[in-house]
Amino acid sequence: MTLFVVINIIVMLGLMALLYMMQKKHVSFSKRVFTALGIGIVFGFALHFIYGSSSETITQTSDWFNIAGGGYVKLLQMIVMPLVFISILGAFTKLKLTHNIGKISGLIIGLLIATTAVAAAVGIASALAFDLQAVHVDQGQAETMRGAELEQKSQDMEAKTLPQQIVELLPGNPFLDFTGARPTSTIAVVIFAAFLGIAYLGVNRKQPEQAELFKKMVDAVYAIIMRVVTLILRLTPYGVLAIMTKTIATSDLDSIAKLGKFVIASYAALIVMFIIHLLLITFSGLNPVTYLKKAFPVLVFAFTSRSSAGALPLNIKTQRSLGVPEGIANFAGSFGLSIGQNGCAGIYPAMLAIMIAPTVGQNPLDPSFLFTVIAVVAISSFGVAGVGGGATFAALLVLSALNMPVALAGLLISVEPLIDMGRTALNVSGSMTSGLVTSKVTNELEKDTYQDRTNIIEAEV
């Protein structure tokens, strides 16, 4: 370890101490995260220009910074499966009207899939409007390595037929899926939790005493898991600082500049899709301004943390402040982690498909091709994880199904973190919109709670 590496680590520790002081002074969580984001960008640029992105000093410094950044991501990954499982199961135990459960879950899943299909169409329109093509993107060493890695993953997936892939969604060994060992582990855990939830409803009708005991156990575990999530989320400012510093310091800024058009096109599509969410809320007879005010804190958190799973507790609390019953809020938030993510599983893979199409001789304006892309994107949106890598998995599924070279998806590695922030915020907005619209359609929405504009949930951890 050189003197310069030691100095860089000391500076990072000093910046973390500053964030800790802000926490002690009770500065709001959102402000602390945004401060960490800003400081990380500035510090990253400073390191980049002083040492150079490929220098030995930066390589060693990044390894040390990764203790905070990578450690934070690992902790989020640790809690995802227990969080998804207990949230789905808790949704069943918290439902007060059990006769509507099929309609409620069907509506939520239907809305998530439908909005993902719309998101795919928006992504296609944006890619065509900005004339995005993979042949216009330079391929450096990092992009080539990433492409080879994606190619290997794709080959592993292509070894199975479509019926076999559908069977793979089922939890043959739920304990294995709790480890996240398979690409479809998330949706498998959702299915397992749903089976337990349905079994609970049956026992509740015939043996209410045993069901009540099970409910208390689930509620207790739910409280413990949510507390663990809170403990992990307290590390968010430090994790964001380390991740952004490392990302900027090690990035090829020339590549980012060249991919600027893709970043702009992505955010244009994300904004259009967010407006569509607001239109859905408006057509449901609700004031979209109220939704914006109440949803802002959780969307900011999702944007800065880049974790739909980490945002789940705040997502559910925000839905409750919007008048969504607790059971529906749990369903919408939990399903939204693994089904129909508008940003990661909708817009992103659709844009990639349009970009790559000309390289394989496919006309991206062919109507039959466009409809195929939308259908494949919607179907493939099952099982996308809510922590890092979900968009990549969705892209692999879609491109493999369309017989396109997945290696070209590696060309976007340098701008992935920039786009992922917006995608995550849209994912969370999509799950909240599905819960809100479902509550309104089923007449379960507490309108007085929705209209109470003072009831705004802040991210407090």
From Swiss-Prot:
Keywords: Amino-acid transport, Membrane, Transmembrane, Transmembrane helix, Transport. Mediates uptake of L-cystine, the oxidized form of L-cysteine. SUPFAM superfamilies: Proton glutamate symport protein (SSF118215). The chain crosses the membrane at residues 1-21, 33-53, 72-92, 104-124, 183-203, 224-244, 262-282, 337-357, 369-389, 393-413. InterPro entries: Na-dicarboxylate_symporter, Na:dicarbo_symporter_sf. It comes from the Bacteria. It comes from Bacillus licheniformis (strain ATCC 14580 / DSM 13 / JCM 2505 / CCUG 7422 / NBRC 12200 / NCIMB 9375 / NCTC 10341 / NRRL NRS-1264 / Gibson 46). One of its GO terms (cellular component) is plasma membrane. It is found in: Membrane. It is a multi-pass membrane protein. GO terms for molecular function: L-cystine transmembrane transporter activity; symporter activity. Belongs to the dicarboxylate/amino acid:cation symporter (DAACS) (TC 2.A.23) family. This is L-cystine uptake protein TcyP. Pfam families: SDF. The lineage of its organism: Bacteria, Bacillati, Bacillota, Bacilli, Bacillales.
